[in-house]
Amino acid sequence: MMRKTTILTLTLSLLSSVQLWAKDYRVSDFGAVADGTTLNTRALQRAIDVIHEEGGGRLIFPLGRYVSGTLHLRSGVTLHIESGAVLLGSNNPYDYDREPGLNTAFLLARGQKNIGVTGEGLIDCRGRQTAYNLVDLIHRGLVDDRLGLDRPNESIRPMIFYFRECDGVTVEGISLKNSASWVQTYDQCKNLKIDRINVESNAYWNNDGLDIVDCENVTVTNSYFDASDDAICLKSHSGAHMCRNILIRDNVAR
């Protein structure tokens, strides 16, 4: 009896600690400006890093328009985009990170745990203009790409999400719009939940709505996909991995 009581007490203590860590932070507290023109990458990345270092929580985006380049999502951090809030992707291709082994994206994560994007707001990456600007840089010799099929390789055009080798991912309620490439890619991720999202992406070539690559334990439910390429696509890029335990139910795709 004493052992059971000790275990229960320890469990409740741990749950209490998790609740204390899971605080809400507002982007304005880190200097983000919601005017639709100011580049907020540095302020937003600092906010994500601080929340991660403090043990996790939600970064709240209230009503407004927030421009940013690539953001790196960290373990324990959820971006919560409220109704009326819009995250706008920068139209400058140089504002997006290019790292070995990772595709270019507005929101990047690799090897992170318990991350998410939630709320009733919108992420609009304005991909058509960003892709056109990238083509211009290639023609001027400032970016190296052979322009196969008269368009930049999809790996250097920014997706909205690229999450790789992450465990415990929640994407819920939000709208995603106008990627310059695939909209969202989850590569070798585990325990992924996608629910009640709205995807409208007809901005450019290769506008897949959702790509699930070598993932395990995935649910995709109650969502809408309007994409100019594959709406929902399961893939494998590695001989050592495969898609396993995937549930896709009650969605609309066109």
Named regions from a protein language model:
Residues 6-7, 22:
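Intrinsically disordered, low-complexity segments enriched in glycine/proline and serine/threonine
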Residues 7-8, 49:
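Short amphipathic alpha-helical "recognition" segments used for binding
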Residues 1-5:
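Positively charged n-region of N-terminal signal peptides that target proteins for export
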Residues 9-17:
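Bacterial N-terminal signal peptides
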Residues 21-254:
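Extracellular/periplasmic carbohydrate-active domains that bind, remodel
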